Regions:
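A short SAM/SAH-binding and catalytic strip from SAM-dependent methyltransferases
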Residues: 106-121
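Conserved beta-strand signature within the Rossmann-like core of class I S-adenosyl-L-methionine
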Residues: 138-146
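A short acidic, Gly/Pro-enriched loop at the edge of an enzyme's catalytic core
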Residues: 98-108
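Conserved SAM-binding loop of SAM-dependent methyltransferases across substrates and taxa
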Residues: 60-71
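Class I SAM-dependent methyltransferase Rossmann-like catalytic core
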Residues: 12-41
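Conserved class I S-adenosyl-L-methionine
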Residues: 50-59
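Class I S-adenosyl-L-methionine
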Residues: 153, 157, 168-210
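C-terminal lobe and adjacent flexible extensions of AdoMet/dcAdoMet transferase-like proteins
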Residues: 193, 202-298
Length: 298
């Protein structure tokens, strides 16, 4: 299952959940990663308790169960092209509104769905835009999760740019509401991480967007989200950070570590931080002894 969706990806676009063995493997290998990703997103993003939730491409129901556990009073409607217990059959590429689904929703979730649809980036962006237009309440939230592969992540970033151009607001993880700077170089992409789901297992990496119909853009050019793991080498510490000022490499020499910049040692992927007093260089920002770093809420 992992090879079919992440490796050679020969299962992408197939109705693999109709196969009993593959469904069992998906439930044990992939579904827990969906749960971990959603838990991480909901823990770091302010989302009002939803009254109605639509789970698009529900798979084996991991998102539905996680949402019910978090918001027990929510009505959760789940759809997938392969039906299951409590999951309606629906082909989300045929109509914007799945057959049998009425009304609007406070929360839309599409986990590991877009990359499996027979649509190009423009088609995926139009589909998400139509979901938000026809299915989402005015103050609602749409959460998209995709695999943290280079191409699937870059595709999601390209979808992001089109959605922003269409007037939607990216509440997370982006602090920048302009074109994504990670798309400027082919090797760059963007993903976040959740804790490991079991001892001996790798951490859960994922790419995601939290979308709303409107929002207040961040204009503080000193504010950044960390978008890489720490890189320590040759007496220095480096991290990539992204915000209204762009996607920059932040660097500090070990000999310039000080009480005001020591937070850099503790920053993890996804953290939001204000960086004051850093020196602009050709390849990014250099934090010196007098630079001041302050952690902010996500």
């Amino acid at each position: 299952m992992h090879r079919g969706l992440v490796g050679a990806r020969e299962l992408v676009g197939e109705a693999y959940l109709a196969d009993t063995e593959l469904r069992r493997e998906y439930e044990s290998e992939i579904a827990p990663r969906t749960t971990a990703a959603l838990e991480s997103i909901f823990a770091s993003t302010t989302i009002a308790a939803p009254r109605r939730v639509l789970d698009l491409g529900a798979g084996t129901g991991a998102a539905r169960e996680m949402i019910r556990a978090r918001w027990s009073d929510a009505e959760v409607v789940a759809v997938d092209k392969v039906p299951g217990p409590g999951i309606l059959r629906a082909d989300v590429t045929r109509t914007v509104r799945p057959i049998g689904v009425d009304g609007r929703f406070d929360l839309l979730v599409a986990a590991h769905l877009l990359n499996e649809l027979p649509l190009d980036v423009d088609g995926r962006a139009r589909l998400v835009q139509n979901w938000c237009r026809d299915l989402l309440e005015e103050q609602g939230t749409c959460v998209l999760i995709e695999p943290a592969l280079r191409q699937t992540s870059r595709d999601l970033l390209a979808v992001r740019d089109r959605l922003i151009a269409a007037g939607l607001f990216v509440a997370a993880p982006c602090l920048l509401q302009g074109p994504c700077p990670a798309l400027l170089r082919e090797r760059d992409f963007c993903h976040m991480s959740a804790a490991t789901i079991a001892q001996g297992r790798s951490r859960v990496d994922f790419s995601y967007l939290v979308l709303r119909k409107q929002g207040a853009p961040c204009t503080d050019t000193s504010r950044f989200r960390i978008v890489s793991d720490p890189m320590k080498d040759k007496g220095r510490l480096r991290l990539f950070a992204c915000g209204p000022a762009g996607r920059l490499l932040v660097m500090r020499l070990d000999r310039e570590r000080s009480p005001s910049n020591q937070l850099l040692d503790k920053l993890e992927r996804g953290a939001v931080v204000d960086i004051q007093g850093a020196t602009a260089q050709s390849d990014g920002l250099r934090c010196g002894r007098d630079s001041v770093l302050v952690r902010r809420e996500n």
